Amino acid sequence: MFGYRSLLVLLVTLSLCLLLQSSHCSAVRTYGNDLDARARREIISLAARLIKLSMYGPEDDSFVKRNGGTADALYNLPDLEKIGKR
């Protein structure tokens, strides 16, 4: 009925389609966002503490204007206090 070659081509095509379908399903799978409100608040507060530590250091009264660890230096923001001064 079918020749050996056409049966082989049909099997290879079918296996390739199944392989592509299975890889497509696993790559597109969505993962649920399981962060509740408490975890989000904790992440935000920890990020705020990191920024505060980078700006002020361990003591609150020792403000360091610009060094390698301040947030504006990390994001490469310009020093706005030097603009306009001669």
From Swiss-Prot:
It comes from Aplysia californica (California sea hare). GO terms for cellular component: extracellular region. Residues 1-27 form the signal peptide. The keyword Nucleotide-binding does not apply. It is found in: Secreted. The keyword Signal applies. This is Cerebrin prohormone. May function as a hormone and may play a neuromodulatory role.
